[in-house]
Amino acid sequence: MQYSSKKNSYEDQNFQNRFFNSLNGQNKSSLNQNSSFSESSKQQVVSITYEEIGLFPRSFNRVFDRFFKQLFFDVENLVIQEYRFYRYLFLTTVKCLFILLFVPLGINFLSKNYLIRPVTEYYWNTHNHEIFLNSYQQKRAFTELKNFEEKIYFESLLLSENQIFFGLSEKNSTFPSSEKSQKSEHFSNQDEHTNDFYGKPKKFQTDSSLQQKNEEKVFLFENSKSLAFEPNLNQIHSSGFLIASADFSKNEVQNFQNLNLSNNTSQSKTDFASVFRTSVQKRLQVKILELAKHYNEESIEAITNFFADVLSFITLCYLLVRLEIQINITKSFLLEVFFGLDDSKKSLLILFITDLLVGYHSPNIWELFFQTLFDHYGLPESQTTIFLLVATLPVLLDVLFKYLIFRHLNRASPATVATYHAMIE
């Protein structure tokens, strides 16, 4: 019994050893197959990606290949397939550019007018007590108000104290002492007391509103013993002054009520000063309200522009990730169109873009761009920051253009690079 048990255990051990050896052999064979497959795949990848340079250029091989295809194969189907392929490339490019351009703009417009702006207006007008978004807007508002005050002061210097008597129109009766009577007197050379009393106009001033055709002019007459003939009045006024309106087309003078300047001069000055002061205060109040409303709207607009542009940028990034295949097709089509041009046109296009962005006149364009950008987002306009950006950004773009021309264009089209340098020189 002991001998039989030992024999069975020995056979089991032999069976286990043979089984594990067979498994190891299979694993080794599978590993060898995988290694051989990986080596063959590497060789295939290398053979696919690497193309040996032969005796003739590769363009000759492509030309001969195309020639034999047109000679021995069905040319009509090849032409139709090629046309369909380029049509697909063109439609894909147009569709991709349309989506990348108009979808972010549409998101910007809709979110700005129907989502972000109402929320911003509600928060800014209810929870915020400020009008100005930053100190730069406040400084601009104070500058405009100061200029308006200087304008009013300049207009007040042009007005004299006697202008309450000159420049009165028929529809303007500011002072009750200058009420027009309904009596019209014709010019006459005879007077009931003496022939030497004539009405002599002392001054004549009119507003711009009176410079219309057949409109009555208002001026001041002074009676004096002068032989120089001016419109002679039929009445003698003891005060020596008379306000009259003359209609020269009818040769008539319509009399106003006499003004006794000796009694009413101080009162007229006081009335004029009070009226002028009241009008100046009203104009200042109206201007201040206009400035407050304008800069409040400008602050809301700046905040709305910022959040709407952020949302548009997120949309653009999503489209760039989502439309990766269409973007690659678009790039290949645009590159093919670009390299399909002749050397002079390619050089002219490159020269136009580089001169526009980094040329001699580009600092003015960049300065205008940054000023518009700061106004768009309500940022304080700092000339130092603008000059710093204008001095650095075109230099970086110039270096980038030179690298692209040297790295890529010099390989793809050396004749274009030579033509470009010839145009620059």
Swiss-Prot record:
Its record classes its membrane topology as: Multi-pass membrane protein
Q: What residues form the membrane-spanning segments?
A: 89-109, 300-320, 350-370, 386-406
Q: Which GO biological process annotations does it have?
A: potassium ion transport
Gene Ontology CC terms: chloroplast inner membrane
Annotated keywords: Antiport, Chloroplast, Hydrogen ion transport, Ion transport, Membrane, Plastid, Plastid inner membrane, Potassium, Potassium transport, Transmembrane, Transmembrane helix, Transport
Cite the GO molecular-function annotations of the record.
antiporter activity; proton transmembrane transporter activity
The reaction(s) catalysed by this protein are: K(+)(in) + H(+)(out) = K(+)(out) + H(+)(in)
* Subcellular compartments: Plastid, Chloroplast inner membrane
Return the Basic and acidic residues bias intervals: 180-192
Q: Which InterPro entries does the UniProt entry name for this protein? A: CemA (IPR004282)
The segment annotated Disordered runs over 173-192
> Where is the major localization of this protein?
plastid
According to the UniProt record, where is the region Insert? 159-278
Q: Which domain of life is it from?
A: Eukaryota
Family to which the UniProt record says this protein belongs: Belongs to the CemA family.
What exactly does this protein do? Contributes to K(+)/H(+) antiport activity by supporting proton efflux to control proton extrusion and homeostasis in chloroplasts in a light-dependent manner to modulate photosynthesis. Prevents excessive induction of non-photochemical quenching (NPQ) under continuous-light conditions. Indirectly promotes efficient inorganic carbon uptake into chloroplasts.
HAMAP family annotated for this entry?
CemA_PxcA
Name of the protein this chain belongs to: Potassium/proton antiporter CemA
The scientific name of the source species is Tetradesmus obliquus (Green alga)
